[in-house]
Design a protein with these regions (language model features):
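Rhodanese-like catalytic fold shared by cysteine-dependent sulfurtransferases
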Residues: 147-149, 155, 206-242, 246-248, ...
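Metallo-beta-lactamase
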Residues: 24, 103, 113-232
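Active-site metal-binding loops of divalent metal-dependent hydrolases
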Residues: 31-32, 57, 81, 113, ...
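Conserved beta-strand hairpin/beta-sheet module of binuclear metal-dependent hydrolase folds
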Residues: 1-48, 119-137, 143
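Active-site neighborhood of phospho(di)ester-bond hydrolases with catalytic His/Asp-centered motifs
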Residues: 28-29, 49-58, 77-81, 108-111, ...
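Active-site metal-binding motif and surrounding structural segment of the metallo-beta-lactamase
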Residues: 33-77
């Protein structure tokens, strides 16, 4: 049996190739949308990708089942409870896909979603009766389990799904041998759970000992535990869960229609008409010079989460980036189902050299120079509530970034406004958002709360108190 793990850091997403080394038949489990990596690897090993399995309809990314189906003519498989617009083969509890000396078997494990399955992989030569590995999707993570609260929109409550999850774990997964390898669909940083480990693989035995959600408890206690303290899900999650069930264009089609080079005048005209302009460069570069009223979401950070949270999927998007990274931006937006890119600024910021009237800058301030500001200062901590509770600048107010757009009115228009996050990535997003809304007294705290703690600063300026 051949198993290859593929990991996308930006989405904390793991997908897998499972192949039989005798027959050279391969299956891809929970593929990402840019599928060349699987096709190229299969070719290099002499494998043929005949099967594509989705453990469930993912909410945090668009899966690559359509792309693989069209590129390599593979069959698509879903759990028996799934309904979709495209053709697929239904996997009942116990359904088998034979690869050769390797057997894949579906096990229904609803809870994170109603249609969720776990895929068991058997090496028929070594042990045909017990699985060598299981691919748990979002049912069981390393150190956590899948959140049950993402499907209220389809009439299934978090309470009901949490109950299903308890039964799936207790009556299905935990009945398997301790030595079974566990390969989940997500790792640390994913918002599909609340405490995922950064491990890549574990055994069921280790999870039985150390995973808080697998400890002995009643069903009611489990439901209370799992439904509490889940992080707020990005706005695009519901949209992606639905789009994964639909017929849709392939990523190649999306990229082809999005790669349009536009001159400065066209970009500015479209911006004035209401088109969204995102600048994906690093915070320092954006601060130094950018197109007025553009939103900074750095491509080298948690781009998908914040783009999916702050951008409107129904309003056209224009991109400002280094030209050699534009296609990457389009692909990464496509991974979360944003098909509304209408083009990019030709030559990036070079195009604005002769248009200085369209250039703006964002003020940055260091932790050691805040006390030099004279007058009223409001420090806005845009980290999550939990981060703020774990430690914050005395006198600061907590407005998490994902709610900032709806709470700008709480921030005084007079005096100085300093925004910060933990390390500086999110705060430049916040600063650009505030400036886009007409605020011109905004400073970004370079290095964020980490820099503040490192320099052991105290707040001596007059810090404005506003309602949190």
């Amino acid at each position: 049996m051949f198993i290859q793990r593929y990991y996308l850091e930006c989405l904390s997403h793991a997908s897998y190739m499972v192949a039989d080394q005798r027959t050279k038949v391969a299956a891809i489990i929970d593929p990402r949308r840019d599928v060349d990596i699987y096709i190229n690897d299969a070719k290099s090993h002499g494998f043929e990708i005949k099967h594509v399995i989705l453990t469930h309809f993912h909410a945090d990314f668009i899966a690559g089942h359509i792309e693989l189906r069209d590129r390599v003519n593979s069959n698509v498989y879903l759990g028996a409870r799934a309904k979709a617009e495209f053709n697929f083969e239904s996997l009942d509890d116990g359904s088998v896909i034979e690869l050769g000396d390797t057997r894949l078997q579906a096990m229904e494990t609803p809870g994170h979603t109603p249609e969720g399955i776990t895929v068991l992989a058997f090496d028929k030569i070594v042990d045909p009766n017990n699985p060598y590995a299981m691919f748990t999707g979002d049912t069981l993570f390393l150190g956590d389990v899948g959140r049950p609260d993402l499907f209220a929109s389809i009439g299934v409550t978090a309470y009901e799904l949490a109950g299903m999850l308890y039964e799936s774990l207790q009556n299905k997964i935990l009945k398997l041998p301790d030595e079974t390898l566990v390969y989940p669909a997500h790792g640390a940083g994913s918002l599909c759970g609340k405490g995922l480990s950064n491990e890549t693989v574990s055994t069921l035995g280790k999870q039985r000992l150390h995973n808080y959600a697998l400890q002995p408890m009643t069903k009611d206690d489990f439901i209370t535990l799992i439904t509490a303290d889940q992080p707020e899900a990005p706005a695009y999650f519901g949209y992606d869960a639905v789009l994964n069930q639909k017929k849709r264009p392939t990523l190649d089609e999306v990229v082809k229609k999005s790669m349009k080079s536009l001159d400065v005048n066209t970009v500015h005209s479209l911006q004035k008409s209401g088109v969204q302009v995102i600048d994906v460069r690093e915070a320092a570069d954006f601060a130094g010079a950018h197109l007025c009223d553009s939103l900074n979401i750095g491509i080298d950070g948690r781009f998908a989460n914040w783009a999916g949270t702050l951008l409107n999927k129904d309003i056209p998007i224009l991109i400002v980036a280094e030209v050699n990274r534009v296609e990457e931006v389009v692909v990464r937006l496509g991974r979360i189902g944003f098909h509304n890119v209408k083009g990019y600024l030709e030559n990036g910021m070079e195009s604005l050299k002769e248009h200085t009237n369209l250039i703006s800058k964002t003020q940055r301030i260091s932790a050691t120079t805040i006390n030099e500001l004279k007058g009223e200062v409001t420090i806005v901590d845009i980290r999550s509530e939990k981060e703020w509770e774990d430690g914050h600048i005395k006198g600061s107010v907590n407005i998490p970034l994902n709610s900032l757009a709806n709470r700008i009115a709480e921030i005084p228009e007079s005096g100085y406004v300093i925004v910060h996050c933990q390390g500086g990535y999110r705060s430049m997003i916040a600063a650009s958002l505030l400036e886009k809304e007409g605020r011109r007294n905004v400073f970004d705290l370079a290095g964020g709360y980490q820099a503040w703690v490192t320099t052991k600063q105290s707040t001596n300026t007059s810090v404005n108190q506003i309602k949190n």
